[in-house]
């Protein structure tokens, strides 16, 4: 199969940091064929400066009318995702869409139904499934060394008291805010591990007051999974703030036979911003000092006479967002319905985000 002719919609940070580098890293699978750059001129184009042979369109309808384009990557603000994804699917294109997918569950459901009716792939860019720290946490949970997990805490905390002037991300428009931003990643990771929760309890706030924000920049969301059969209840705690000076706990997982704690962020984003490429040696490799710690007791330990836990350092799994695009290629090629980011998971994330807002507004838990 020749490389899939791909068009990227947008020329912002998302396109140049999270999409172009990974398409470029897989030349036998994807051809960077076209780009939507509305402000491009004959002499000035960000896309053409980076990729001299790329076709640059300033009009979406003209791009979608190009019969050579097989895959469209939607790397635009979330308030336009629904409209553009729908147009792309109706034009017969496979679609990769940046997160957050859509502002509402109903929009997302309609688009998945449209994609299915046309036998097209609709892939949401939940690249943080391939964060090394998350892959490490997942591996430890699946190994059973923690026993039954009863609490899974996931943070994404930064120290950013200021904000960029004029940033669309801080405007009160559909799909904006911390929950739809990093929250959609943390929720997706939780759903991929534990499935859809029974209920959601959340608190959302605007913590930075320089100047006051019109959208939330803090959340604490608890996903409740009740006891089922011989399984203990699980509480999943997801939290993010921009007011966290020097404390970067990423995961804290507690089970009946052990605990795991990890600090620091996955290195891929900072590596990409610094110009490192996905195929470069060391890409996605964590620093030794940020390796997580695992405390365990034997699985068959007597609960009435538990020994002192044994502590070991756990090397971080090497992540690579390139694996997302590998999976996109395989699904388009084989149509095997094996793409790892399933439609029911994406729809669960949409429901949880909507429930988080309702919970915070009503100061109550929302049953899904």
Curated annotation (Swiss-Prot):
Gene Ontology molecular function: kinase inhibitor activity; nucleotide binding; oxidoreductase activity
Alphabetical UniProt keywords: Oxidoreductase
Enzyme Commission number(s): 1.-.-.-
Class of this enzyme: oxidoreductase
InterPro entries, A to Z: Gfo/Idh/MocA-like_OxRdtase_C, Gfo/Idh/MocA-like_OxRdtase_N, Gfo/Idh/MocA_oxidoreduct, NAD(P)-bd_dom_sf
Biological process per Gene Ontology, one example term: negative regulation of transcription by RNA polymerase II
Domain of life: Eukaryota
S-S bonds: none
GO cellular component: cytosol; nucleus
Family: Belongs to the Gfo/Idh/MocA family.
Protein name as annotated: Uncharacterized oxidoreductase C115.03
Organism: Schizosaccharomyces pombe (strain 972 / ATCC 24843)
């Amino acid at each position: 199969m020749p490389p899939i002719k791909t068009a990227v919609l947008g020329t912002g940070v998302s396109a140049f940091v999270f999409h172009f580098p990974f398409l470029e890293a897989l030349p036998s699978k994807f051809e960077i064929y076209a780009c939507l750059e509305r402000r491009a001129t004959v002499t000035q184009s960000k896309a053409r400066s980076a990729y001299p042979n790329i076709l640059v369109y300033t009009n979406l309808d003209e791009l979608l009318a190009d019969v050579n384009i097989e895959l469209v990557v939607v790397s635009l603000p979330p308030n336009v995702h629904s409209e553009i994804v729908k147009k792309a699917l109706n034009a017969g294109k496979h679609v990769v869409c940046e997160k957050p997918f859509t502002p509402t569950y109903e929009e997302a459901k309609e688009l998945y139904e449209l994609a299915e009716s046309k036998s097209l792939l609709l892939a949401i860019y939940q690249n943080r499934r391939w964060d090394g720290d998350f892959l490490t946490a997942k591996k430890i949970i699946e190994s059973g060394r923690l026993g039954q997990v009863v609490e899974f805490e996931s943070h994404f905390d930064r120290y950013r008291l200021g904000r960029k002037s004029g940033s669309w991300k801080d405007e009160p428009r559909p799909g904006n805010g911390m929950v739809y931003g990093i929250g959609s990643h943390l929720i997706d990771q939780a759903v991929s591990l534990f499935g859809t929760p029974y209920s959601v309890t959340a608190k959302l706030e605007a913590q930075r007051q320089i100047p006051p924000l019109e959208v939330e920049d803090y959340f604490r969301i608890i996903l409740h999974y009740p006891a089922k059969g011989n399984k203990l209840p699980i509480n999943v705690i997801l939290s993010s703030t921009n007011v966290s000076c020097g404390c970067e706990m990423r995961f804290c997982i507690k089970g009946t036979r052990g605990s795991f704690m990890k600090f620091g962020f996955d290195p891929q984003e900072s590596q990409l911003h610094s110009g490192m490429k996905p195929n470069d040696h060391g890409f996605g490799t964590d620093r030794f000092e940020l390796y997580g710690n695992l405390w365990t007791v034997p699985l068959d330990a007597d609960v009435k006479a538990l020994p002192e836990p044994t502590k070991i350092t756990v090397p971080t799994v090497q992540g690579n967002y390139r694996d997302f695009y590998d999976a996109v290629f395989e699904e388009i090629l084989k149509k095997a319905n094996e793409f790892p980011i399933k439609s029911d998971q994406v729809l669960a994330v949409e429901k949880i985000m909507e429930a988080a807002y309702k919970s915070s507004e009503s100061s109550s838990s929302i049953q899904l």
